[in-house]
């Protein structure tokens, strides 16, 4: 018998609005070696405009007086990165016109929405590369980041046709 926690986990769904993927503005992304404990919209561009310079071993900048060393990471060919934010269900339902709602229903059949289990996301920006920063040294090969970026080519190789010999 499943407990209520497992039942709740099974019900959780994330809905991505396809219309937000059509033409999001390009963005400049930076993966910093720190945590900024904010989970609300913030005018980052007003406070973080990096003065990036080319050093002898790569990119250099500073953040709050600390030296940062970085490298540009390119999204794998054939893919696009998106910045997504959560939208409230009430806002989403108000934004969609009949055509968008029908398009959404073709991609995802309508189901009963559950207040605490359904999350709605929309793309706010797109990117084809981003900068990874390390504190005072160029970041090493981050296993999670490298794994995520190499996965598409690995998946393509696994699923490719094998020539018969």
Swiss-Prot record:
GO terms for biological process: RNA catabolic process. It holds the Pfam family RNase_H2_suC. One of its GO terms (cellular component) is ribonuclease H2 complex. The modification N-acetylmethionine is found at residue 1. It is found in: Nucleus. Gene3D superfamilies: 2.40.128.680. Belongs to the RNase H2 subunit C family. Non catalytic subunit of RNase H2, an endonuclease that specifically degrades the RNA of RNA:DNA hybrids. Participates in DNA replication, possibly by mediating the removal of lagging-strand Okazaki fragment RNA primers during DNA replication. Mediates the excision of single ribonucleotides from DNA:RNA duplexes. The RNase H2 complex is a heterotrimer composed of the catalytic subunit RNASEH2A and the non-catalytic subunits RNASEH2B and RNASEH2C. This is Ribonuclease H2 subunit C. The gene is RNASEH2C.
């Amino acid at each position: 018998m499943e407990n209520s926690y497992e039942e709740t986990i099974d019900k959780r769904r994330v809905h991505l609005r396809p219309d937000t993927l059509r033409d999001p503005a390009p963005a400049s992304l930076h993966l910093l070696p720190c945590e900024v404990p904010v989970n609300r919209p913030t005018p980052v561009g007003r406070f973080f405009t990096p003065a990036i310079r080319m050093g002898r071993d790569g990119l250099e900048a500073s953040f709050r007086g600390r030296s940062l060393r970085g490298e540009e990471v390119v999204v794998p060919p054939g893919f696009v990165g998106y910045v997504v934010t959560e939208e409230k269900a009430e806002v989403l339902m108000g934004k969609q016109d009949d055509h968008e709602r029908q398009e959404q229903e073709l991609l995802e059949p309508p189901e009963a929405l559950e207040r605490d289990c359904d999350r709605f996301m929309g793309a706010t920006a797109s990117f084809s590369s981003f900068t990874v920063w390390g504190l005072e040294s160029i970041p090493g090969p981050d296993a999670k980041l490298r794994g995520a970026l190499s996965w598409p080519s690995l998946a393509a190789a696994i699923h490719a046709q094998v020539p018969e010999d």
